């Protein structure tokens, strides 16, 4: 564990920072996704998520992060996958699907850092994410391919093809 001013970073045994995020959808049709402005670059959009706290489960961390960053509550759905980022930082992010049921007018990050949120059609969200956060665009690409816990996990190798 390492400490940031307001947070304890947690790592898995392989040295990956443990993170959780949600693709927050306006409805169960999953055709509009909520993105939030980056805290570092307010003109860039990202998928809400962040580091897991000690003893926190991925699903609880995902719900907490979207509440803090996007000011939403909702119905937590499936685990879309576990995504690894190795280039600049070693992150392992559990990404869940959440259907939004409540939008808070003011929320923690809107008040403290002026964070914004906006609904995007899936294709538009992929375009805005690909420039600055390509791994976030991957979440939506997997969703478009019918991502669900039954068809694989981005961090796990694919099973070998069986011979006919």
Swiss-Prot record:
Keywords: Cytoplasm, Hydrolase, Magnesium, Manganese, Metal-binding. Mg(2+) 1 binds at residues 49, 69. Mg(2+) 3 binds at residue 65. Mg(2+) 2 binds at residue 65. A motif (Nudix box) lies at residues 50-71. Its EC number is 3.6.1.52, 3.6.1.60. This is Diphosphoinositol polyphosphate phosphohydrolase 3-beta. It comes from Mus musculus. The gene is Nudt11.
